[in-house]
């Protein structure tokens, strides 16, 4: 029986996604402005969607770390790509944000989501290549 080896990309994917999740919950989220009628602004919902997407990506990354099968790891990395693209498109494209560029949703949340998403896509692509190369051996 083969021993389960943890690859560097396993850890990198998990760290990026945990930081993405914690960032959206505590550091990178939108401001707490509420409309005059008491309802939340659109940027609040963009932050909620990003936190939820980051949570799903974190669970996928944790499964990626724990599962020893290389084919399954490649599939989990492939599943991270559309999640990351979705997270990249949410702020400002799928959910509109505040109009002022100086607001927290545009100046902090959007760049953080884009950077984290791009890092996950790059790392997942590298991991897919690594896992498929291992499977071919």
What are these regions (language model features)?
Residues 1-20, 130-134:
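Cytosolic juxtamembrane helix and N-cap/initiation of the first transmembrane helix
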Residues 19-30, 82-97:
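C-terminal TM-helix exit segments that contain a strictly Trp-centered aromatic cap at the helix terminus
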Residues 29-33, 66-73, 96-100, 132-136:
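Transmembrane helix-loop junctions in multipass membrane proteins, especially transporters and channels
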Residues 49-64, 117-122:
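Hydrophobic alpha-helical transmembrane segments
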Residues 63-85:
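Loop-to-transmembrane helix junctions at the membrane interface
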């Amino acid at each position: 029986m083969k021993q389960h080896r943890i690859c560097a990309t396993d850890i990198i994917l998990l760290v990026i996604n945990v930081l993405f999740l914690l960032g959206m919950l505590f550091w990178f989220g939108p401001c707490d402005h509420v409309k005059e009628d008491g309802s939340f602004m659109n940027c609040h919902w963009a932050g909620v969607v990003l936190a939820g997407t980051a949570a799903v990506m974190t669970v996928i990354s944790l499964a990626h770390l724990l599962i020893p099968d290389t084919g399954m790891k490649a599939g989990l990395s492939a599943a991270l790509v559309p999640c990351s693209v979705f997270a990249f498109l949410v702020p400002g494209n799928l959910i509109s944000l505040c109009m002022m560029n100086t607001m927290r949703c545009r100046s902090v949340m959007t760049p953080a989501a884009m950077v984290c998403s791009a890092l996950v896509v790059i790392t997942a692509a590298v991991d897919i290549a690594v896992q498929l190369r291992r499977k071919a051996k």
